[in-house]
Amino acid sequence: MYLSPSKITLALCGLLLTAAQALASQAGWRQITIPGTTADAVPITAVLYYPTQAVARTIAMGPFTVNVSIQTAPEAKVKGLIVLSHGTGGSELGHSSLAEALAQNGYLVAALRHPGDNWQDRSLRQTSLARYATARPQQASRVIDALLQDPEWKGRIASDTKGPRVGAVGHSAGGYTVLALAGARPEPSRFDAHCNAERADDPIFCSTGNARLSVTNDAAAAPLIPPLTDTRVRAVVALAPMGALFTAASLAQIRIPVAVYEAQQDRFLVPRFHAEWVAVNVPGVEMHRVPNAWHFAFMDTPSMSIPSEDGDIAANPPGFDRRVFLGQLQRELPAFFDKAFN
């Protein structure tokens, strides 16, 4: 078939316009507060990242930098809702580049600040293991409740015959959180069993703040863990997850798409006890091993040194380029959810 030069030019212009439109979305940003409930009176602060046509700008927020358009109008429809759960003592801003990438690709992202387990308030870590293990997934489910009922958002979130498209991403204790939403069940007695046997090889998990959550502080821990599965969640990504608490049987019962990322030099949550334990038990898991990466490779690099039980959160092993790796993750996460929902 012959195409005249003018038709070729028009076709190319159309392709360029389509490409420009595909990349036109920026990340909008706004902070919300989710009121307390009868069961849990503590409100939840969350940041929403969403696709918008407004121009984004680079803004420093504490030790992190975001590239967003604040309080601007969202697009009429979003591909789905993604809940983002930070690690213990973390922040709703610590994974902003991943949230921005998902928003630029059409998703509404709700990054919550876990009450009692964030950089300002670690009171949840002073409670029993049963309370800690229960509270985090329930907090994430409250965020889903709020946004699926919100008049501004409920009509924007894409749905199909299975219902609204909802996914979740979590890092570290956030990885635990999203796996619990997917159906993995924690068993408090596994903490003492694991640390009695493996403390020397998993020292940070067993010897820092989590040690206060020992089952010995909770005489009736196992019966206190209610079902945590949120059947609205249809795909999850667990980044360097805390996985040793989960039973193999419950991991084997997960029936939604799961991606697990392992930092191969992780000393905070040693992979063979956590990420790999999850990966060998979840059917059809998509496993990614990140060479030469430490535990905090999945977080944006802060502008200042932030100490942790495993050293400076801003530091990287020699030869590891966090910026390049996060760029890869910013492509892979939207692709994972696109595939899971379609």
What are these regions (language model features)?
Residues M304-N342:
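Catalytic active-site module of serine/aspartate enzymes centered on a nucleophile-bearing elbow/loop
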Residues L129-D160, D192-C206:
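Alpha/beta-hydrolase active-site loop
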Residues S25-L84, G94, Q104:
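Domain-level recognition of soluble alpha/beta enzyme cores
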Residues G89, L93, R113-Q138, A146-L147, ...:
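Cap/lid segment of the alpha/beta-hydrolase catalytic domain
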Residues D145-L148, G175-E187:
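Short glycine-enriched nucleophile-adjacent loop
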